[in-house]
């Protein structure tokens, strides 16, 4: 079964990599082999997927498309506990006291760097992912992104499932990367990324601070995010059509359907 699945996966990946506007920039053969091991049940535990990339690369959109497509398939075929999402942003340290002291989040952010991995408790995130992979239910933290910098701990139950997926700026950094079976990096051109950032900044009413925020994020990305691409099994194009991502995921799910349903 493993040999058959690996052969089919190689063909599916080959066809996509050689298509116009492919979703892939790079795929390691070891990633395809590992996927075949999971799909053939040679590895019987849950698998974990980490998706990283700089701000406005498209990683959150890609992660949600993966989650929604798999959940739709799971509902159709009555598969329980198909996929669980771990939100990396929920692991930002609680800095609500510092926000209050500064008078506003904007003032706080001028003196506190949120664009470095040290701003997040990534060791706790790794612990939670490992616990889920061992079949345990975990209570996750929840970080308030509205500007209070409040993090409430042990509030969101996460249940063990077949796939644990997480995306974030620092998902492939040293303190957490070993938690993932599949390491994915989303690559995007500078011009597209900048355009997306400023569109989002306008929606969030960043005003005059947008330039400063963008410059800081870009500079820190060169140090903390871009180098993590070297750890990736798969590099995706953050500029590919969303429909192309869904189509590819459905091809993998069609193989699952052929084998097990």
What kind of region is each of these model predictions?
Residues 55:
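The conserved Walker
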Residues 62:
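Hydrophobic positions on the alpha1 helix immediately C-terminal to the Walker A/P-loop
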Residues 93-143:
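Conserved nucleotide-sensing/catalytic segment adjacent to the nucleotide-binding pocket
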Residues 151-201:
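ATP-dependent NMP and nucleoside kinases share a basic, alpha-helical "lid"
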């Amino acid at each position: 079964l493993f040999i058959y699945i690996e052969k089919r996966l190689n063909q599916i990946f080959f066809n996509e990599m050689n298509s116009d506007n492919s979703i892939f920039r790079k795929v390691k053969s070891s990633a395809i082999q590992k996927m075949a091991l999971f799909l053939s049940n040679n590895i019987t535990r849950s698998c974990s997927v980490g998706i990283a990339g700089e701000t406005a690369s498209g990683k959150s959109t890609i992660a949600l498309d993966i989650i929604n497509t798999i959940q739709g398939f799971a509902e159709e075929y009555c598969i329980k506990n198909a996929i669980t999402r771990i939100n990396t942003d929920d692991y930002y340290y609680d800095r609500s006291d510092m926000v209050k002291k500064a008078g506003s989040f904007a003032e706080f952010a001028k003196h506190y760097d949120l664009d470095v991995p040290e701003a997040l408790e990534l060791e706790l995130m790794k612990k939670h992912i490992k616990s889920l992979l061992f079949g345990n239910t975990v209570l996750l933290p929840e970080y308030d992104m509205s500007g209070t910098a409040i993090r409430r701990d042990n509030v969101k139950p996460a249940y063990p499932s077949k796939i644990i997926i997480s995306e974030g700026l620092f998902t492939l950094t040293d303190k957490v990367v070993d938690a993932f079976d599949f390491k994915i990096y989303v690559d995007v051109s500078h011009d597209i990324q900048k355009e997306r950032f400023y569109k989002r900044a306008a929606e969030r009413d960043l005003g005059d601070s947008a330039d400063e925020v963008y410059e800081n994020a870009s500079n820190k990305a060169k140090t903390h995010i871009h180098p993590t691409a070297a750890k990736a099994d798969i590099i995706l194009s953050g500029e590919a059509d969303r429909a192309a991502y869904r189509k590819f995921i459905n091809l993998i799910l069609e193989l699952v359907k052929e084998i097990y349903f």
